[in-house]
Amino acid sequence: MANVADTKLYDILGVPPGASENELKKAYRKLAKEYHPDKNPNAGDKFKEISFAYEVLSNPEKRELYDRYGEQGLREGSGGGGGMDDIFSHIFGGGLFSFMGNQSRSRNGRRRGEDMMHPLKVSLEDLYNGKTTKLQLSKNVLCSACSGQGGKSGAVQKCSACRGRGVRIMIRQLAPGMVQQMQSVCSDCNGEGEVINEKDRCKKCEGKKVIKEVKILEVHVDKGMKHGQRITFTGEADQAPGVEPGDIVLLLQEKEHEVFQRDGNDLHMTYKIGLVEALCGFQFTFKHLDGRQIVVKYPPGKVIEPGCVRVVRGEGMPQYRNPFEKGDLYIKFDVQFPENNWINPDKLSELEDLLPSRPEVPNIIGDTEEVELQEFDSTRGSGGGQRREAYNDSSDEESSSHHGPGVQCAHQ
């Protein structure tokens, strides 16, 4: 006798654990014929057990899991399927999967309703200073007139079609001796597992057990919260009979700011200055997210290069739950150069005397050819498509040494 962890499925088919594939098939066909619902209408549960046992044991991978680890192997190794939980509970006395699909269960064992997700748009000022706002939502609550029963006391009856489960197991024959089990929502009770005569239904909720109610939530956006962060209101989602309400979850969505960009607890901004400011120092002010007017000074004689970044410590975003600690503010300077011919040519020599000396130009030896620098418009391309084709015919090693013409000089 084979050494296996559990023999219940083998016992259902009446075969030993070491049974061959042919022995399993023979036993299954015999039992399926005897307990088929068409022949034996009262043996539906028995037929499901037989089909489930054969489905597991006829699959080499599932059989190996079951032989080695028993019930636990099937729990952890199977991906689940419609109706399997109901069948598994008949055999092992416990559910393999949640019978109602994707609904989870709470710690007290009750089914738990779905969470309600709502986006909440907030400004960068809101996230910097914190904000309290009110949000109006519509949700289902248990009908107070019938206490969520749907009708007067005693009028609610278990659905006979699905036996109160809300779903029905359908058996479809694929081939002689081979059947498929399918699970579908019960059409008689619309998946509720209960039916109420129309004359006995609650007038307020019309037998639906729940009514719509407007809920006002007070939302606290704390200082330092971030885009994508969640604010959860536990148990405030839709109510339903016998179901623990899920949560209302607000997903923060930060709106774009015209001045600042956020990076974690740091802030970034770009400021334009002229050439004279870049060379001779400057002073400017800006309004911070809390309304303060911040003055930035840079001394004469210290040069600001185009595109350089300077930092102001402690003027970034407050840390979440530690708002007295703040990140930094990074300022990128966009140096604006004068337009062409902005100065009288006669004055250029005076300007050059004030600026650092030019580098020495090396002596030109041999034949030379003078070329002209022109404006480059990246939207029109380089115009050198035909010339580039010649390079494409060269070897990979040669072509890798040629740089494309799309690199634009920075104006300085």
Swiss-Prot record:
The modification Phosphotyrosine is found at residue 391. The modification N6-acetyllysine is found at residues 39, 152. Residues 359-412 are annotated as: Disordered. GO terms for molecular function: ATP binding; ATPase activator activity; Hsp70 protein binding; protein-folding chaperone binding; unfolded protein binding; zinc ion binding. The keyword Amino-acid biosynthesis does not apply. PROSITE patterns: DNAJ_1 (PS00636), DNAJ_2 (PS50076), ZF_CR (PS51188). One of its GO terms (cellular component) is cytosol. Keywords: Acetylation, Chaperone, Isopeptide bond, Lipoprotein, Membrane, Metal-binding, Methylation, Phosphoprotein, Prenylation, Repeat, Ubl conjugation, Zinc, Zinc-finger. Its main location: membrane. The modification Cysteine methyl ester is found at residue 409. CXXCXGXG motif repeats lie at residues 143-150, 159-166, 186-193, 202-209. It is a lipid-anchor. Zn(2+) 2 binds at residues 159, 162, 186, 189. A zinc finger (CR-type) spans 130-214. A lipid is attached at residue 409 (S-farnesyl cysteine). The modification Phosphoserine is found at residues 78, 123, 394-395. It is found in: Membrane. Residues 8-70 form the J domain. Signal peptide: none annotated. There is a cross-link at residue 134 (Glycyl lysine isopeptide (Lys-Gly) (interchain with G-Cter in SUMO2)). One of its GO terms (biological process) is response to heat. It holds the Pfam family DnaJ. Zn(2+) 1 binds at residues 143, 146, 202, 205. Co-chaperone of Hsc70. Stimulates ATP hydrolysis and the folding of unfolded proteins mediated by HSPA1A/B (in vitro). This is DnaJ homolog subfamily A member 2. The gene is DNAJA2.
